[in-house]
Swiss-Prot record:
Component of the 17S U2 SnRNP complex of the spliceosome, a large ribonucleoprotein complex that removes introns from transcribed pre-mRNAs. The 17S U2 SnRNP complex (1) directly participates in early spliceosome assembly and (2) mediates recognition of the intron branch site during pre-mRNA splicing by promoting the selection of the pre-mRNA branch-site adenosine, the nucleophile for the first step of splicing. One of its GO terms (cellular component) is U2 snRNP. The modification N-acetylalanine is found at residue 2. Residues 232-268, 332-381, 388-424 have a biased composition (Pro residues). This is Splicing factor 3B subunit 4. Pfam families: RRM_1.
């Protein structure tokens, strides 16, 4: 248990233990700190007259990492009802002491060293356990304490943040403490700050910043940047948060799509009998009497590879020749539908008008607007609704109604002979 000379100790692996009760012995101190790591030796200075220890001791560990771990887990724990102070040896603390000592006044009597350590350790490294001045007879707090920080940055932050704050329902006062060797001069002078800046040990143990690595507050999302480099949405697209544009009328182009340019005029005799009419197949391919196959298959649906500009050029009706000229004017007559398909002409007299051809959308004879620019979907009839009653076929004449069939009556039973008067 007995320690060797101080010069033979590993000061970096030795911790100072203060605030020990008189019942604490070296074997108990050995077993207590053995939980933090392997202990080399323990030493508790004793009074030569009484033979009792003076309330503090030293514990040497096998490595410096074990000593640092013991300081973290053993500091301010209670032993026999008293919180013990565990930190590095005093020789090491003297090298780190730069004079950043603060005074804390108007403390509540219930505040102990543990509460002060937990409160002020958020601002930086504390070299020694906070010292609360107590009455030697009763042990009650006198209402003020001292804290020694490892840097002036930590002490400045503690004074700025905690001065005037409430701690246990009392506003505390935090300022630099007075120096012991001079009257009326406080710590934190320019000379002390200059010496602290030149101390390499104090620069190695910089105080930690609790909220220095906090993420920045979330900012507003940036608008969509188009290919033009501005914050406006692309042409034809509604701005964020607005309603979709209305559905364009049949035959009209959706907003934002430029109209198709008319084809250049053809010289006479370049592929037909006279200049072709607008919209004919020969208008876009001079020198050919017959153009390429129709861009739309029978049924009115365009090819998947066609763009919106080609749809606008070929017309809104889904046919390859929307504006064919009359016979004899140089244009070609409209093509006849394949067998089995209804003729696009007017219906016979008395018949209801035909609906749109198979494959074309209801109510939209023109090209469909591009995806993302359509309006709300059309209202659909409720489930089970069959529509109004159909009219009778054309030429049907209802004849006179047949007479109602007589309902047979049940036979009446024959009546018997009349009875005479009842006997008296």
């Amino acid at each position: 248990m007995a320690a060797g000379p101080i010069s033979e100790r590993n000061q970096d692996a030795t911790v100072y233990v203060g605030g020990l009760d008189e019942k604490v012995s070296e074997p108990l101190l050995w077993e207590l700190f053995l939980q933090a790591g392997p202990v080399v030796n323990t030493h508790m200075p004793k009074d030569r007259v009484t033979g009792q220890h003076q309330g503090y001791g030293f514990v040497e560990f096998l490595s410096e990492e074990d000593a640092d771990y013991a300081i973290k887990i053993m500091n301010m724990i209670k032993l026999y009802g008293k919180p013990i102070r565990v930190n590095k040896a005093s020789a090491h603390n003297k090298n780190l002491d730069v004079g950043a000592n603060i005074f804390i006044g108007n403390l509540d009597p219930e505040i102990d060293e543990k509460l002060l350590y937990d409160t002020f350790s958020a601002f930086g490294v504390i070299l020694q356990t906070p010292k609360i001045m107590r009455d030697p007879d009763t042990g009650n707090s006198k209402g003020y304490a001292f804290i020694n920080f490892a840097s002036f940055d930590a002490s400045d932050a503690a004074i700025e943040a905690m001065n005037g704050q409430y701690l246990c329902n009392r506003p505390i006062t935090v300022s630099y403490a007075f120096k012991k060797d001079s009257k009326g001069e406080r710590h934190g002078s320019a000379a002390e700050r200059l010496l602290a800046a030149q101390n390499p040990l104090s620069q190695a143990d910089r105080p930690h910043q609790l909220f220095a690595d906090a993420p920045p507050p979330p900012s507003a999302p940036n608008p969509v940047v188009s290919s033009l480099g501005s914050g406006l949405p692309p042409p034809g697209m509604p701005p964020p948060g607005s309603f979709p544009p209305p559905v364009p009328p049949p035959g009209a182009l959706p907003p934002g799509i430029p109209p198709a340019m008319p084809p250049p005029p053809m010289p006479p005799g370049a592929g037909g009998h006279g200049p072709p009419a607008a919209g004919t197949p020969g208008a876009g391919h001079p020198g050919h009497g017959h153009s390429h196959p129709h861009p739309f298959p029978p049924g009115g649906m365009p090819h998947p590879g066609m763009s919106q500009m080609q749809l606008a050029h070929h017309g809104p009706h889904g046919l390859g020749h929307p504006h064919a000229g009359p016979p004899g004017s140089g244009g070609q007559p409209p093509p006849r539908p394949p067998p089995g398909m209804p003729h696009p002409g007017p219906p016979p007299m008395g018949m209801p008008p035909r609906g749109p051809p198979f494959g074309s959308p209801m109510g939209h004879p023109g090209p469909m607007p591009p995806h993302g620019m359509r309006g709300p979907p059309p209202l659909m009839p409720p489930h089970g609704y069959t529509g109004p009653p159909r009219p009778p076929p054309y030429g049907y004449q209802r004849g006179p109604l047949p007479p109602p069939r007589p309902t047979p009556r049940p036979p009446v039973p024959p009546r018997g002979p009349l009875r005479g008067p009842l006997p008296q």
